[in-house]
A protein has these predicted regions:
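Long, domain-scale functional regions
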Residues: 22-220
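C-terminal, structured domain-capping segment
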Residues: 1-23
Length: 220
């Protein structure tokens, strides 16, 4: 949880699922049009400012494929909104992040660190109902990772990603069933983010002028 004062704008993520008997899935199209690179050009924890393409890493469901750096070919138009492809999940569904902002943000939490009880989740659910509900057949009911497990004097996610620089797609926190959520700090790091400002990776959004919100915990 990254706390800021006042209201900000933020972006949400959804998972595009599979329909039975589909022979050419969205994941198939992505893999057919992108070479899977063996390793990243920059170290994990460093800002990725070049197009590092598609890489692979294990997640909770199997082998996942993710984009990293200043990628240009991960754009998708869905539900009349522009999205960025974050990764192909191990189960074949696709994680998208909105390439824009959702207005009307309240603070991430009141007195609770749990995402499912947060004000931001209620706002995301409201936005989903008003904007994406009619596309529900294509959006997966997914287990999002809400990693707010304490580890000594900080949160496990902070120590793992910021201090030790070993981000993972395997959830070490609590899984939240939802059709919409936020990225984790692990996902931001693997996409090319770091503790330094990076304006040259695909998650950078000039419309977000305040703090980024994730589903991972951190002391402020």
């Amino acid at each position: 949880k990254f706390k800021v004062n006042g209201n900000e704008k933020y972006s949400g993520t959804i998972q595009i699922g599979l329909k039975e008997n589909d022979k050419n899935t969205f994941a198939d199209v992505i893999l057919a049009n992108n070479k899977v690179n063996e390793k990243s050009l920059t170290g994990i924890g460093e800002s990725a400012i070049l197009d590092e393409g598609l890489l692979k890493k294990e997640d909770d469901h199997g082998v996942a494929y993710y984009f990293r750096g200043n990628v240009k070919n991960n754009n998708v138009l869905f539900a009349d909104k522009n999205w960025k492809i974050v990764k192909i999940n191990g189960d074949g569904s696709i994680k998208l992040v909105l390439d824009g902002v959702i207005d009307e943000l309240s603070k991430y939490y009141e007195e609770d660190y749990a995402f499912s009880n947060s004000t931001i989740y209620k706002n995301l659910e409201k936005w989903y109902t008003n904007t994406l509900d009619s596309y529900g057949d294509y959006i997966a009911y997914y287990k999002y990772c809400n990693d707010y497990v304490l580890d000594d004097d900080n949160y496990l996610a902070y120590n793992r990603v910021i201090t030790n620089k070993i981000p993972t797609y395997v959830c070490l926190g609590n899984l939240v069933n939802s059709r919409i959520g936020l990225l984790t700090v692990d996902e931001v790091s693997l996409a090319g983010g770091s503790t330094s400002e990076n304006k040259k990776f695909y998650l950078y959004n000039e419309k977000i002028t305040g703090a980024y919100y994730t589903m991972s915990g951190a002391m402020t």
